[in-house]
A protein has these predicted regions:
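Short, charged beta->alpha transition segments
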Residues: 1-6, 26-30
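Beta-strand-turn-beta hairpins that frame and shape the catalytic cleft
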Residues: 2-17
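CN hydrolase (nitrilase-like) catalytic-core segments centered on the catalytic cysteine
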Residues: 13-16, 20-129
Length: 130
């Protein structure tokens, strides 16, 4: 697992956490990152595409931040999801194996630093430290 802080954003720096797919299944790790990172990246080389799609769907709400999973073109199954209303939740989704794909999209992780974001945060969520 890696956590880096970048001078991106108008008011606060952006903290990005990254892990490989196996480490992402460690719920203690994910719980620890909940208040520390603003975006979570997952690198995968995984055949079990459906399980990791479902995991990203759960993690972006649990962590209350954008979660991006990039899987190998050999297996497909890359996705980017943010905790927004249902019609805005899926930023990118690529399925199918043996293909190369590039998705370009914009994600603003600063939306989720406070409790006044577009989607209701978790119960008891007080925002991330700035």
């Amino acid at each position: 697992m890696t956590l880096i802080e970048l001078p991106i954003g108008t008011k606060w720096n952006t903290r990005i956490a990254a892990a490989i797919c196996y480490d992402t299944t460690n719920l203690d790790l994910v719980a620890d990152l909940h208040g520390r990172s603003d975006m979570f990246l997952v690198a995968a080389l995984n055949q079990d595409v459906q399980t990791f799609d479902n995991m990203v769907a759960a993690l972006h709400f649990r962590m209350y931040q954008p979660v991006l999973l990039t899987n190998s073109g050999e297996f497909g199954g890359s996705t980017a999801q943010v905790p927004l209303p249902k019609h805005e939740r899926l930023s990118a989704h690529v399925h199918g194996n043996q293909q190369d794909a590039v998705s370009v999209f914009e994600v603003d992780p600063s939306l989720f630093k406070s409790i006044s974001a577009a989607k209701a945060p978790l119960a008891g969520y007080k925002g991330r430290p700035r």
